[in-house]
Curated annotation (Swiss-Prot):
<keyword id="KW-1003">Cell membrane</keyword>
<dbReference type="Pfam" id="PF00437">
    <property type="entry name" value="T2SSE"/>
</dbReference>
<dbReference type="InterPro" id="IPR047667">
    <property type="entry name" value="ATPase_ComGA"/>
</dbReference>
<keyword id="KW-0067">ATP-binding</keyword>
<dbReference type="GO" id="GO:0005886">
    <property type="term" value="C:plasma membrane"/>
</dbReference>
<dbReference type="GO" id="GO:0016887">
    <property type="term" value="F:ATP hydrolysis activity"/>
</dbReference>
<comment type="similarity">
    <text>Belongs to the GSP E family.</text>
</comment>
<dbReference type="GO" id="GO:0005524">
    <property type="term" value="F:ATP binding"/>
</dbReference>
<dbReference type="InterPro" id="IPR027417">
    <property type="entry name" value="P-loop_NTPase"/>
</dbReference>
<protein>
    <recommendedName>
        <fullName>Competence protein ComGA</fullName>
    </recommendedName>
</protein>
<comment type="function">
    <text>Required for uptake of DNA by competent cells. May be involved in assembly of a complex forming a transformation pilus at the surface of competent cells.</text>
</comment>
<keyword id="KW-0472">Membrane</keyword>
<dbReference type="InterPro" id="IPR003593">
    <property type="entry name" value="AAA+_ATPase"/>
</dbReference>
<feature type="binding site">
    <location>
        <begin position="138"/>
        <end position="145"/>
    </location>
    <ligand>
        <name>ATP</name>
    </ligand>
</feature>
<dbReference type="InterPro" id="IPR001482">
    <property type="entry name" value="T2SS/T4SS_dom"/>
</dbReference>
<keyword id="KW-0547">Nucleotide-binding</keyword>
Length: 313
């Protein structure tokens, strides 16, 4: 019974294109929520003991400590259902009552349709003509990885393309994909060094996480390859400021940084802001105009519009 419930949850989530599944403990029940794009929807409330058992089932499959319900844990697994496999990342933590919550991130290893409100892939691709470093920023689930893979197919067809990811999210036969495994020394730093020996035309680096990775990404860009990577920031200006915080100099950025793309999924589609220079002075007028248009066309509410606008103070 527990396994059947778990499989039905994953089946339903995959059908909806869900990025995240939330098991939220309440006083005497569990609430189940799913996030699709920028919307987090409540699916229902369920028997507490039954869904606590479902959480234990997922933890067991992911190799986590089933008996530990207070401390946070991370896990991952390839979950089998209906003769299919779903790649999952799990995170658990207990609240003050010792009731455990679970978040499951679904890695959709097949390509997802990426719909933009005001641009298409061909139009966006015109911004990526020069060799060097291109950075993609935006929240989790905003389509950064999908956009990087779409651009790699349209701009680097038949060329040497490599990726370094943690984990590999979209499996591609037309590129060499490497996956982090720090336990055996496969760190971002080491894999970047290894990949450069293969002389890639495009190197996709999953995420700039720290100063070490930032320095390695800059060095890779200086070899003449085109490099795509993601970074956590809330705007184009924020990307530039984050790189400086990580120890990359303005002189280095002037040489290697060819473009910054900031994107979000809003109202069921993506919107993009792009800059190829003057990152520190970038204005949010184009972004805010797109938000205003979505509001005018009835795709978002006035509250959403107010929340999604960017203001540089």
């Amino acid at each position: 019974m527990v396994q059947e419930i778990a499989q039905e949850i994953i089946r339903s989530a995959r059908k909806k294109g869900t990025q995240d599944i939330y098991f939220v403990p309440k006083l005497d029940a569990y609430e189940l929520h799913m996030r699709v794009g920028d919307e987090r929807c409540k699916i229902g409330s369920y028997d507490f003991e039954k869904f606590a058992a479902v959480i234990s089932h997922f933890k067991f499959v992911a190799g986590m400590n089933v008996g530990e319900k207070r401390r946070s844990q991370l896990g991952s697994c390839d979950y089998a259902y209906d003769h299919k496999i779903a790649s999952l990342r799990l995170s658990t933590v207990g609240d003050y009552r010792g009731h455990e919550s679970l978040v499951i991130r679904l890695l959709h290893d097949e390509e997802q349709d990426l719909h933009f409100w005001f641009q298409d892939i061909e139009e966006l691709g015109k911004q990526y003509r020069q060799r060097g470093l291109y950075l993609f920023a935006g929240p989790v689930g905003s389509g950064k990885t999908t956009l990087m893979h779409e651009l790699s197919k349209s701009l680097f067809k038949g060329q040497q393309v490599m990726s370094i990811e943690d984990p590999v999210e979209i499996k591609q036969d037309d590129m060499l994909q490497l996956q982090l495994n720090e336990a055996i020394g496969l760190t971002y730093e080491n894999l970047i060094k290894l990949s450069l020996r293969h002389r890639p035309d495009l190197l996709i680096i999953g995420e700039i996480r720290d100063s070490e990775t930032a320095r390695a990404v800059v060095r890779a860009s200086l070899t003449g390859a085109t490099v795509f990577s993601t970074i956590h920031a809330k705007s184009i200006r924020g990307v530039y400021e984050r790189l400086l915080e990580l120890g990359v100099s303005e002189e280095e950025l002037a040489v290697v940084l060819q473009g910054v793309c900031y994107q979000r999924l809003i109202g069921g589609g993506g919107i993009v802001d792009f800059a190829s220079r003057d990152y520190q002075e970038h204005q949010a007028a184009k972004w805010n105009e797109q938000i205003d248009q979505l509001l005018k066309d009835g795709h978002i509410t006035s509250l959403q519009a107010e929340t999604e606008k960017i203001s540089y103070s």
